[in-house]
Regions:
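A conserved switch/coupling segment of P-loop NTPase cores
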Residues: 2, 12, 20-37, 44-47, ...
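Short beta-strand-centered segment that lines the nucleotide-binding/catalytic pocket of NTP-utilizing
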Residues: 71-73
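Conserved lysine of the Walker
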Residues: 50
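Short conserved motifs of the RecA-like P-loop NTPase core
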Residues: 220-226
């Protein structure tokens, strides 16, 4: 079965270097004991390449996971929107793969902890109630915590305000799966079972990246001149 993907940025085919960081990230994920949830934190200056590394890791390991969820977490509003859209994506997925053919949205809503918040067409009901919004935000976490659903990857990208993500509500309350967090805040390391400080590219990797981009620019210029 193909991996279910939500929000995962396109793979950068010109990605260069970062072998050490990718190896460390794999070591954190693979080194966790059986029954231990794996949480890897990539922290460093803004624009240093944390997101790029997380994207590359996800694409390199797509065959390992049954689902990959990319949650934009720079602001509270952005996180809320991302989780709501992810929940809607999940509802469509569950409906399309419903065992009896015709999806029962009442059952789907109940299983996701959002009873009364999915209409007859499978769309989330717009509710201004804070409790309803919190339930929708927690629906993905609830689904990822279900028995047998253990080979997933959940990425919280750009968690630069550590108050935005609520570990109790937004992290699946189970011992399975993998979470990756990217953040500028060094304090985020306390959230992980392992952390990586991301620094600038090695000199050879930086040169290789420049040459690759220069080659692409030249190809584009040549194509324009033809």
């Amino acid at each position: 079965m193909a991996c279910l993907k939500f929000g995962l940025p396109s793979q950068n085919l010109q990605f260069t270097g970062r072998i050490k960081e990718l190896q460390l990230l794999s070591a954190i994920v693979e080194g966790a004991g059986k029954g231990q949830r794996k949480i890897a934190v990539l922290h460093g200056l803004g624009g240093i390449g944390k997101t790029d590394i997380a994207v590359q890791y996800a694409w390199q390991n797509l065959a390992v996971y049954t689902s990959v969820w990319w949650i934009r977490s720079a602001t509270a509003e952005g996180l809320k929107r991302s989780l709501m859209t992810a929940t809607q994506h999940l509802i469509h997925h569950l409906a399309a793969n419903y065992a009896s053919g015709q999806p029962d949205y009442i059952v789907i809503a109940r299983d996701l902890g959002i009873a009364g918040l999915i209409d007859a067409s499978g769309q989330l009901v717009d509710s201004a109630e804070s409790n309803d919004q919190e339930r929708v935000e927690g629906a993905l976490s609830k689904w990822l915590s279900m028995d047998g659903n253990d080979m997933w990857l959940l990425v919280f990208d750009n968690v630069d305000d550590l108050k935005v993500v609520d570990k109790t509500r937004h992290f699946p309350q189970c011992s399975s799966g993998t979470i990756i967090i990217t953040s500028r805040r060094r304090g985020s390391v306390h959230w992980g079972t392992g952390s990586i400080q991301v620094e600038g590219l090695e000199k050879d990797d930086a040169l290789s990246l420049l040459l690759t981009r220069a080659s692409l620019d030249q190809e584009q210029l040549n194509a324009t001149g033809e």
